[in-house]
Structures are given as structure tokens and as C-alpha cells.
Amino acid sequence: MNQSLDRVGYTGNRMSQPLVGMDLTDLREALGSDQPGYRAKQIYEAIYRGQAANLVQISTLPAQLREDLAARHEVGLPEIAHLYQSTDGTRRYLLKLEDGRTVETVLMPDGERDTICISSQVGCPVDCKFCMTALMGLERSLTAGEIVGQVLLVARENQLRQDGGRLNIVMMGQGEPLLNLENVVKATRILLDPAGFGLSPRRVTVSTAGIIPKIAELGREPVRPKLAISLNASTEESRQELMPITRKYHLKDLLAACKAYPLRPWEKLTFEYVLLRGVNDTDADARRVVKLLSNLNAKVNLIALNPGPGIPYATPDPERVASFQNIVRRALPCFVRKPRGLDIYAACGQLKRNVT
């Protein structure tokens, strides 16, 4: 694969360039110097705050300007190739991108809260042995517009509003976000901009397998999402077996990077731990997790393995999960994530373009 495409995502040869993914600076350049500066802001707010699906819907613009823009640009949302609906209300979207590749996005309604799980890459290069996405390998990284477009499309399709504090975004779908950091940062700036999509930083989380240099880089961003770390083992040896990329990024160095990460007053680091029967789910593992995280402002999310074809591990019994949680939560906030969308392959670690 072309390395520049792998790094920054698809640019393509389309006749009309997408507006989704552009920030205010990009939009001003697209409009040209003959348009007043406030026109860019009108487009920006209409697309991200107003969720306009096409240029016709941006009624604040003069008709001639809309016509001129339409000759060169389109809003540029992905296309729904297929929608899978779970008995628990979860929806898995297979989205077709401009180059014909597909990526998956999941909506998880839960009473008064909705969560959209979005992807940062088509496939994933990290090769976690318990994750079905790893079986795809990496096809390419997504552009900022393709990342934001997932949110806009799912929000529009389900009449979700970004205000009111009920919508959460988690970048825990396909891909390793920190290996596409440039586009992830640009996308999250738009999602967190009050004039853009307008979410609070408390409502957006990016998950990483532990790409140490990029953790520090993300920490320097003035406006950034919350950070979650995929831990998944209590020893270096076990972690390297389950997550081969960690042979490059060692556990002690990861914990040091987490210690140095600048947390806001309200913030904790989240550590995610996928429990695999007989592999990393013992009481001794739980005690080692407590020791590893003892000097961090952290919480732990436990995920009992969501099974799938090609995954050589089993889900632990509920009693084993409860025992693990009870040990960890004596020292740290510890929660068990409820599986969502198991019947449509929409749960954590199951996103591999499966047809149900």
C-alpha cells in the first residue's frame, strides 16, 4: 500500500471534494477570497451543528453560491451499504466510502444515553489475537471527513442531538486511532468545537493499544478527547503474546507515559481489559492489575470476550468475571461492560464486515 495513503487516508480523484472534514480554515480556502469570511462559518455550522445532508439544505447561503459550491463540492457523507439491527436495540452500520471500501459504525441506544462507536481505519494493523478486526489487516486509514462523517450520518439517521449531554462518541471501532493521529485530532477538534458538532470533551473517548509516542503527542493537544488504554494482560509476556504490537511498546514504558499524561481535573484514564478464559482472568491477574495501576488516576473497564469466528479464546464464566472485578474494585473503580449487539457481530472486537 502507498505509505502516504496508509498514514493520512484516502484522498481520491473524485470530481467534487467533500466538505465534511473541513475546518474553518479549509472552508475559507475553498470559498476563495471573493466571499466574505462569515460564509465559511455559515457552512461550517450548517454541516456540523445543523447536520445538513446536502448544499440545498444550507438555506443561509445565497442560491448562486450554493450552485457554485455544488459544482465543486458535496457534503460527502458515507453511504449506508447495509444496516443490521440487534434484538437489544443496537445498530451496526456497514458504510461504503468513496473508494468502494467499507467501514463499520455502531449505535448503542441505552435509555437516556446514546453511544456511537466509530472507526479510525479500514481494518487494523495492531493484530490483537482476541479481536476479529485484526483478521482483516489494515487496508487504509480514514480521512478526518470519513471519521466525522460516521457521526453525522448515524446522528442524522436516528435524529440524535449533540446537546443535552446524552450522546457519547467512542473511537473503539475498526483501527488504531493513534496510528492515524493527524486525522483523528482534526476530526475530534470538529466534534468538540462549540461551533462545530459541539460535544463536550467528557463525551468523546479515543482508545489505543498503547502507541507511546502518540500518547504524549495527543496529550499536548489543547482540545482533546478522553483517553482509554487497552491493557488486556497483567504481565509483559502475556501482553506481548495477546497484542504483538506491544513488543515495541513495553508495559513499563506505557505506564510511565500514562503517569505523565496531563489529565484534566475531572478526568481519569480508562484501562480496558478483555477477559479470556484461562488466559488472563485469574485472581492473581486481578491483583497484578491493581499493582500496575496503583499510582495512576485510573478506572478499569472489564470486557468478557465477545466470541467470533477465527478467535481461539473462550469467554469466562460470569462468576470468574465477578471475582476479578471484586478484587480490582477494592482499589480502583472497576466496571463490567455490558455486551451490546452480540447477535449481529456489533460488540467490542467483532467488527469484521460479517453478514448476519
From Swiss-Prot:
InterPro entries the UniProt entry points to? Aldolase_TIM, Methyltransferase_A, RNA_MTrfase_RlmN, rRNA_lsu_MTrfase_RlmN/Cfr, rSAM
Keyword Transferase among record annotations = yes
The note on cofactor binding and number reads:
Binds 1 [4Fe-4S] cluster. The cluster is coordinated with 3 cysteines and an exchangeable S-adenosyl-L-methionine.
Q: Which family does the similarity line name? A: Belongs to the radical SAM superfamily. RlmN family.
> Where can this protein be found?
Cytoplasm
**Other notes:** Reaction proceeds by a ping-pong mechanism involving intermediate methylation of a conserved cysteine residue.
Q: Keywords assigned by UniProt? A: 4Fe-4S, Cytoplasm, Disulfide bond, Iron, Iron-sulfur, Metal-binding, Methyltransferase, rRNA processing, S-adenosyl-L-methionine, Transferase, tRNA processing
Q: What is this protein called?
A: Probable dual-specificity RNA methyltransferase RlmN
Record GO cellular component, one term: cytoplasm
**Residue sites binding S-adenosyl-L-methionine per the record:** 175-176, 207, 230-232, 306
> What is the native source organism of this protein?
Solibacter usitatus (strain Ellin6076)
What residues make up the catalytic site? 104, 348
Q: List the disulfide bonds.
A: 117-348
PANTHER family, alphabetized: 23S RRNA METHYLTRANSFERASE, RADICAL SAM CORE DOMAIN-CONTAINING PROTEIN
Q: What is its EC number?
A: 2.1.1.192
Summarizing the function annotation, the protein's role is:
Specifically methylates position 2 of adenine 2503 in 23S rRNA and position 2 of adenine 37 in tRNAs.
Known catalytic reactions: adenosine(2503) in 23S rRNA + 2 reduced [2Fe-2S]-[ferredoxin] + 2 S-adenosyl-L-methionine = 2-methyladenosine(2503) in 23S rRNA + 5'-deoxyadenosine + L-methionine + 2 oxidized [2Fe-2S]-[ferredoxin] + S-adenosyl-L-homocysteine; adenosine(37) in tRNA + 2 reduced [2Fe-2S]-[ferredoxin] + 2 S-adenosyl-L-methionine = 2-methyladenosine(37) in tRNA + 5'-deoxyadenosine + L-methionine + 2 oxidized [2Fe-2S]-[ferredoxin] + S-adenosyl-L-homocysteine
Which Pfam families would you find in this protein's record? Radical_SAM
Q: What is its main location?
A: cytoplasm
Single GO BP term: rRNA base methylation
For [4Fe-4S] cluster, which residues are the binding ones? 124, 128, 131
Query: What's the cofactor?
Result: [4Fe-4S] cluster
What does the record give under GO molecular function? 4 iron, 4 sulfur cluster binding; metal ion binding; rRNA (adenine(2503)-C2-)-methyltransferase activity; rRNA binding; tRNA (adenine(37)-C2)-methyltransferase activity; tRNA binding
